[in-house]
Amino acid sequence: MDISFVKTPAIQDLLDRVAGTTSDKGDPRVKAILRDLVESLMVLIVKHDIDENEVWGAVNFLQNGAGEFGLLMPGVGLEHFLDLYMDAKDAEAGKSGGTPRTIEGPLYVEGAPLVENDANLTDDPDDTDTLYMAGRVTGPDGEPVTNAILHVWHANSKGFYSHFDPTGEQTPFNNRRRIRLGDDGRYAFHSKMPNGYSVPPGGASDRLMQVLGRHGNRPAHVHFFIEAPGYRQLTTQINFGDDPFAADDFAFGTREGLLPVPNRQGDTAHIAFDFQLQRADDPEEEAFSHRARLAVA
């Protein structure tokens, strides 16, 4: 059987009723999206001759792996696709330049301490090298961005993030800060060197990667949000260019221009990295995306 089966009157009538298109109640946009989504799933079932057991196996996988959706989204490339799609829309609108955006990941925590420049991020003992990172935040014409707040977070040397550490050993907001920048747009911080991590062994993401013949590893990296009045909010991260997984990030977070190589000297490592923001055309562009994030009082 071919996918023309999905276009038969009986199936098309079913889709109309599923999406509520026969009713003038509800949200027309949601109806259209749901209809296309369900129809696409039907096409997949017919195209690949997916049987009943496989369908319910997929449902069980999603139910049991719901706690790892934040890892599955980047793992199957959807979070990176959103970045590429937004880049394409920017190009279509004539917007260009600025530090590349890349995936946020699932491990941001709201409410990190707000500190002044030259901040220490690490509260807990960690037997590893010290990272020093500094640079400038500028606008599209090279002007220093004033009143900016740089959010920064990363893992510890074991690859664990505070608030998500399965060992429970990290104090709240370890390796997490919001840094208020001065009028010169300069930032600086130091912390203990992060390490990369892998998805939880035996979890939904790990099982899917094994079925696909892929690994679930991320290189060592540091996450950033940057917000400032009059500029587009930036979500990005740097992957350490000398990490063996920098060119093969399971989450597809590696992007050209975001791969600095730390200058390692004894027990310290230094990264100089400048960020460039785009101007906002409206206040909505200054705001964060509306995804759910962990908030800690």
Report residues per predicted region:
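Beta-strand-dominated extracellular/periplasmic modules and repeats
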Residues: 2-297
